[in-house]
C-alpha cells in the first residue's frame, strides 16, 4: 500500500471555523492512524479575500489544539516558513507551475479562453433562471477560432480560461463516506480554471497541487462534493491518477441548520478566548460526525489516533451542541490540576476586577484554593467570574426563597454561635478545620445532616447548594467567616 499523504488546505480569509478544525483533525488522525504524512498548504489564490495575519492566526489555533503537521507552512518565532520537498506550499508562490499545466490543457483542447463580460454572464444566468433552467455558462466561447482568440489576446481583451467538459457524459468516483457518486456533465458548468488576474481558481490549483504533492486522500467538507466530478475529469485529461475522496458532513446547530456566526460561537478563537481546554474541544469536535465503535465519549488525542476511522464518519450532518461540549470541557477542567486552571483563570479575574496584577503574587495560593472549590462548577475557565462573587463580598444575602426559609429555622442562632466560637478559637483555617468543626458541633449540639450543613452554607454563601462546605470554609478564611456570620446574626435573623 502506498504511503498515506493528506493535507489541510485553508484559505487565509478570516477566522478559523470550528468546521475547519474538524477537517484538520480528521486529516491529522487519519495520517497518524496510518503512519502517514499530514501537510498544511495555504490556498490564497483569491487575493480579494486575503486577510492579513489570517495564516498566522490559523497556525496558532492549530498549534493550540495540538493538531500538528509534518510538512508545509509553519510559524517559527512569528515568521512564516515552509518545510518539505514538495513546496512552495503557498499557492500564490506557485503561479508558474499552474501556467505550465494550463498551457498543456489549452494545447490539447481541454480548456479554452472565454472573453464574455460580467454583464453578458449575468444576462445569461437571469434568462436561464427565468426559464427554470440551471444557471451555468452557455459555452459561448467554446468553439472560438484560434485566430480570433489570438487577436483578442493581442488586443488586450480581458479573459478567463475555462475547462472544456465533454457533453452528456457520466463521471463517476468513489467516496469513502458516500460510496459511488455519479454526475452527468450536462448538469455541470465549464469551470473557470484561470481567472482574469492570472491566478488559478480553487478547482484548478487543488488538482495540480494535490497531484504534485502526491496526496493520496482528499478529506474535505461536503460543500466540495458537487465540484468533485470536475476535479476527477481534470485528473483524467491530465493523465494523472485521482486521489481517494472523503467528503465530511456539515456541522449543524441544534435546530439542524448549518452552523453560522449569527447563532453563536463558531470560531476556534471564540472558544480559546472563553477558556475552553484544547483537549476538550478536540475531543468533542471529533465526535461531531464520527462515531466510535462503543459508547465511549472521553478520548485523549492518543485514543482518537488509535480509534479513528473514515468508515465510521456519518453521511448526515453532525449536531454541534454547546451543552455537550460544556459537559466534556467540565470533565477536563475537573481532571486538571488547580495550578493549571488558576493560571488560566487569573486573566479573567483581573479583567473582571476581582484582583489586580499586583495582588496575584501574594494571593496566588488563595486563588488556587478558590479554583479548587469552583472548578467542578465551571463550563469553561472564563465562567469562573460567574461563581466567585460570594468569595469577595463581606456580606451575603440569601439568593432564593428556600435560602431565606432556612435562615428562619429556630435552631439557627444557636448553630451559628457554636460555629463562630470554633472559628474564633482556631489558630488557622486549613483543609482539616471545616470537617473537624462541623463534626464537633454535631457531637456537642446534636444538629446533623441538612439541619447542620444547610444553614451554615446559606449564611456563608447565600445559596443552599454548592461546592464542598469544608472547602468553602477554608477559602473564605477566618476574617470572612467571622464577618459573614456576624452579618447574618445582626441583619438576617
Swiss-Prot record:
Its main localization is cytoplasm
Q: Where in the cell is it found?
A: Cytoplasm
Please identify the protein, giving its name as recorded.
Answer: Glutamate--tRNA ligase
Q: Tell me how the cofactor is bound.
A: Binds 1 zinc ion per subunit.
Q: Which residues form the signal peptide?
A: none
* GO annotations of cellular component type: cytoplasm
What's a BP term from Gene Ontology annotated to this protein? Answer: glutamyl-tRNA aminoacylation
List the Gene3D superfamilies.
Answer: 1.10.10.350, Glutamate-tRNA synthetase, class I, anticodon-binding domain 1, HUPs
Give the multimer and partner information: Monomer.
Superkingdom of the source?
Bacteria
- Binding positions for ATP per the UniProt entry: 261
Which residues are Zn(2+)-binding? Answer: 114, 116, 141, 143
Which InterPro entries does the entry link to? aa-tRNA-synth_I_cd-bd, aa-tRNA-synth_I_codon-bd_sub2, aa_tRNA-synth_I_cd-bd_sf, Glu-tRNA-ligase_bac/mito, Glu-tRNA-synth_I_codon-bd_sub1, Glu/Gln-tRNA-synth, Glu/Gln-tRNA-synth_Ib_cat-dom, GluQ/Sye
Q: What is the enzyme's class at the highest EC level? A: ligase
Keywords on record: Aminoacyl-tRNA synthetase, ATP-binding, Cytoplasm, Ligase, Metal-binding, Nucleotide-binding, Protein biosynthesis, Zinc
The chain's coiled-coil residues are none
* EC identifiers of the protein: 6.1.1.17
What is catalyzed by this enzyme? tRNA(Glu) + L-glutamate + ATP = L-glutamyl-tRNA(Glu) + AMP + diphosphate
Task: Give a short account of what the protein does.
Answer: Catalyzes the attachment of glutamate to tRNA(Glu) in a two-step reaction: glutamate is first activated by ATP to form Glu-AMP and then transferred to the acceptor end of tRNA(Glu).
Motif: 'HIGH' region; annotated at 10-20
Required cofactors, per record? Zn(2+)
